[in-house]
């Protein structure tokens, strides 16, 4: 039975939404066992007793969003996140899911779970929506690394392409390099060198992609340095929130005609909202570690966490980590 470590105390809605999500997913995943790390009293109130698929590991500390990541990992040794990461490191669990402090989770992933031998740097990779289909696209790295080298981006592209194929079911994923122009000679020295590395690789490399093209579905995998990727991710998320707020305000606070228009456009608006629902893709994966580590947004509700649990099950089923170990440790 595969074992998924759940940081039950991470995020704004912990532990209730996390428990609800796992209990919803559990009947669909009979081969998985869920190990909850956190406040034992709260866990026992929320979880069924005598369930072979559920285990509780009591912890006494929580890493907060405002905690400094490295210091938190070193000083809060009995926190739900750190204890869960150690269980994964020791082989007592096969994967880790957390909604907690992103920096702390990255730190625990890199320094406790550890990176795969041969992988220069792990990369953080979410799946984002596109306008043309429900398939979405992967973008890596979105903030695990402040600085990057060409070989990092090549490895991220290789791992992300394999993920897109095996977990998302994309045949021959199209890989693109985020750049400031479509031409091959665009960008700084880093991007020019990465372009050549991708061109010479066995990946289905389609060239550069510009920022305004990201949501158009022109690539299945977009590779970028962590600094740029983090800025792009936050820009997309922020713009989406602003647009939704403006639509709601415009339709509901501008008189009877606007409200009537909202009623008439209800189905179309629902369709658009469904297309750009990124929760259905699960969380962001820290690719390149000895075991899967997935970060779901701290504000996630039970529905979003449910999809992250299903995502981890798929990653374990496809045995991605061992494939990466065989490939990069040569």
UniProtKB/Swiss-Prot annotation:
One Pfam family hit: FA_synthesis
Molecular-function GO term, any one: phosphate:acyl-[acyl carrier protein] acyltransferase activity
Localisation: Cytoplasm
GO biological process, alphabetically ordered: fatty acid biosynthetic process; phospholipid biosynthetic process
Disulfide bridge positions per record: none
Biological pathway: Lipid metabolism; phospholipid metabolism
GO cellular component, one term: cytoplasm
Keywords, in A-Z order: Cytoplasm, Lipid biosynthesis, Lipid metabolism, Phospholipid biosynthesis, Phospholipid metabolism, Transferase
Enzyme Commission no: 2.3.1.274
InterPro entries: FA_synthesis (IPR003664), Phospholipid_synth_PlsX-like (IPR012281)
Highest taxon listed in the record's lineage: Bacteria
Reaction(s) this enzyme catalyzes, per UniProt: a fatty acyl-[ACP] + phosphate = an acyl phosphate + holo-[ACP]
Subunit structure: Homodimer. Probably interacts with PlsY.
Role summary: Catalyzes the reversible formation of acyl-phosphate (acyl-PO(4)) from acyl-[acyl-carrier-protein] (acyl-ACP). This enzyme utilizes acyl-ACP as fatty acyl donor, but not acyl-CoA.
The family this protein is said to belong to: Belongs to the PlsX family.
Protein name: Phosphate acyltransferase
Species annotation: Lactobacillus delbrueckii subsp. bulgaricus (strain ATCC 11842 / DSM 20081 / BCRC 10696 / JCM 1002 / NBRC 13953 / NCIMB 11778 / NCTC 12712 / WDCM 00102 / Lb 14)
């Amino acid at each position: 039975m595969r074992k998924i470590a759940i940081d039950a105390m991470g995020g704004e809605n912990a532990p209730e939404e996390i428990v609800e999500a796992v209990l919803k997913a559990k009947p669909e995943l009979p081969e998985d066992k869920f190990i909850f790390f956190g406040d034992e009293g709260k866990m026992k109130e929320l979880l069924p007793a005598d369930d072979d698929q559920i285990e509780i590991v009591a912890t006494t500390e929580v890493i907060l969003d405002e905690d400094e990541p490295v210091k938190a990992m070193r000083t809060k040794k009995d926190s739900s996140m750190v204890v869960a990461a150690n269980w994964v490191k020791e082989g007592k669990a096969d994967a880790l899911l957390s909604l907690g402090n992103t920096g702390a989770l990255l730190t625990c992933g890199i320094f406790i779970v550890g990176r795969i031998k041969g992988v220069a740097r792990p990369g953080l990779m979410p799946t984002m929506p596109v306008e043309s289909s429900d398939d979405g696209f992967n973008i890596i790295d979105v903030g695990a690394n402040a600085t990057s080298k060409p070989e990092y981006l090549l490895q991220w592209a290789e791992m992300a392409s394999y993920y897109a194929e095996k977990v998302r079911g994309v045949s021959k994923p199209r890989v693109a390099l985020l750049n400031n122009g479509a031409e091959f000679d665009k960008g700084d020295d880093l991007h020019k060198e990465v372009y050549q590395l991708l061109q010479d690789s066995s990946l289905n490399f389609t060239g550069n992609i510009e920022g305004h093209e990201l949501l158009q579905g022109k690539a299945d995998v977009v590779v970028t340095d962590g600094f740029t990727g983090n800025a792009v991710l936050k820009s997309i998320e922020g713009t989406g929130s602003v647009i939704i707020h403006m639509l709601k305000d415009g339709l509901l606070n501008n008189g009877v005609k606007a409200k009537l228009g909202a009623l008439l456009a209800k189905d179309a608006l629902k369709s658009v909202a469904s297309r750009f629902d990124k929760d259905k893709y699960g969380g962001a994966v820290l690719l390149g570690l000895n075991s899967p580590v997935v970060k779901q947004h701290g504000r996630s509700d039970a529905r979003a966490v449910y999809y992250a649990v299903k995502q981890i099950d798929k990653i374990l089923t496809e045995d991605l980590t061992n494939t990466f170990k065989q490939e990069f440790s040569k």
